[in-house]
Amino acid sequence: MKRIAKWLGGLVIVALLGAAVWLAVAPPAMIRVATNYAAKIVCSNVFIAGRSPEAVMATDVQAPGHPIFKAINVAVDRTASPPRVTARLLGFSGTGEAVWRGERLGCSSLPEGEIADASMPDGVSREPVTGAADKLWPEGERVDPSQAPEIADILDDSALGGPGMRAIVVVHGGRIIAERYGDDFGPQTPLLGWSMTKTVTAAILGTLVKDGRLSLDRTGLFRSWDGSARADISLASMLEMSSGLAWNEGYGTVSDVTRMLYLEPDMAAYAASKPYDPENGNPDGDSRFNYSSGTSVMLSDVWMRAVEAPVSYPWRALFDPLGMSSATFEMDAAGTFVGSSYMYATARDWARFGQLLLQRGAWNGRSLLPSGFVDWMTEPASASETAWGGHAYGRHVWLVGPRGSVPRGEDPEAAFDLPADTFWLRGHDGQTVTVIPSRDLVVVRMGLTPSDRNYQPQGLVDALVKALAGQ
C-alpha cells in the first residue's frame, strides 16, 4: 500500500511539474489574452492618467473581470527604455507586456515582444492653449456650472449616473453647464473611450474626404484583397459595418476581437485576413450588418497610408483645432492607430468632440469635416435594420443607446422619450457621448460599468432633456 501511495504521489508531482512547464513554455491563448490585457490597461492608466498600478489592477482589471485576473501579477518598470509593464499568471506564466511610447501615443501591447518605431514629430505639442485656464470652455478650461437645482439633482442621482460613474459632463448652448466626477477622478483625468474611438476614426477619415485624399466609394483598400470579392468592399460599407467580412466581436473568450487586441502585433493585417462571409451578421439586424472592431482598425490603416506624417495627423487635423490637449491615441506594435478602441481624453475633451458633431463638423468658423458628412454619418444604415423595426447604426455612430436589460429584438429606447435626432458614441464598460442637435445638447457619461449591470444612460439623458425644457 505504501508503495502504491508513493507511486501515486510521484505521478501527482510529475503531473504538477508538467503542468507548470506547459504553463510557462506554451501557455494557452486565453492566458496570454488576459496577461496582455492586464499589462496594457495598467500601462495606459499609469502613464497616461497618473493612477497607481495597484488601484488599476484592483478596480479596472480584477474587480469587473474574469476570475483569471485574480491570479495575475503586474510589474511596472519606469526605468526601462522604453518604460514598460509586465504581467504574468501566478508570477511565471503567459508573460504579457506593454510599453510606453510617449506623450500623445500612450502605450502599446507587445504580444510578440517587438515594437515598430513611431514617434511624434517635433512641433506637435500637447500643451494647452495659452490662457486656457481663464477662457470659458470650449475655448479654454474655465467652467461656470449651472445653478439650476434640477440639473444638480439629476447629476447627484446615483441611479441616473449609474454604477461605477467616473465623469458626467453636460454641454448646453455650447457651454458646460454642469459636471460631476467619481472618487479619484476629475476634470484633468484622461479616460479610455473604448469603442467611442470608432467615431473619432470616422471623423479623421472625414477630414481626408474633405481634402480629396479619400473618397467614400473607394475600393481596392488592401493589396491582399486583389482578385477576391473583398476588392469590391468600399470605405462607405466599412463605415456602416456592412463589409461582409467574417468577424466575431465577442469578449468572453478568445474571439476575433480579443485575439486582435491582445495577441496580434499587426492588428490591421489580421483583420484584413478575414474571409468574405456576408452571411456572418448581427442577430439583431440584416445579415450584412456585423459590428467589427477589426473594421475600424483597418480604416486607421487606410487613412494612415493616405497622408504624409500620419503619426501627427490626428492632432493636426482634429485634436489641436478642437483644443483637445489631453487626447492620447494609442497604436499597435506595428505602429497603426487602434482606431477601434484606444483613445484616452478627459471628459471635457470628449465633450469637445461631441460638440463638433453637433455643429456638423464646424469649429470656430472653420469646417473640419465635409459639408453633409455628419448628416451622412447619422443617417440610418440600411444594413442595421432591427427586429423591432428601427435602425441601430449609422456610419460609425449609434442611433440608439445601450440595451441594458431590454431583450434582444425589442426597442432599447421604448421606455424613454428622447428626441428623434439623438445619436450616440458608445464604448465598452459604460462610455457614452450623447448628441442631440435639436436640443443643442451634448452629454458625456464615462465610468467602469460592465454590461451585466444593465445600466442605461438614456435615463440620465432623458431627465436632462426634460429639465432643460422646463418639463
Question: What are these model-derived regions, one by one?
Answer:
Residues 174, 191-217, 238, 299-303, ...:
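Active-site SXXK
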Residues 324-331, 379-442:
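Active-site Gly/Thr loop motif
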Residues 210-246, 276-281, 305-345, 372:
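Active-site helix/loop module of the DD-peptidase/beta-lactamase fold
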Residues 226-287, 294-297, 345-348:
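Conserved catalytic neighborhood of penicillin-recognizing serine enzymes
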Residues 30, 422-471:
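Structured C-terminal helix/loop/strand segments within mature extracytoplasmic catalytic/sensor domains
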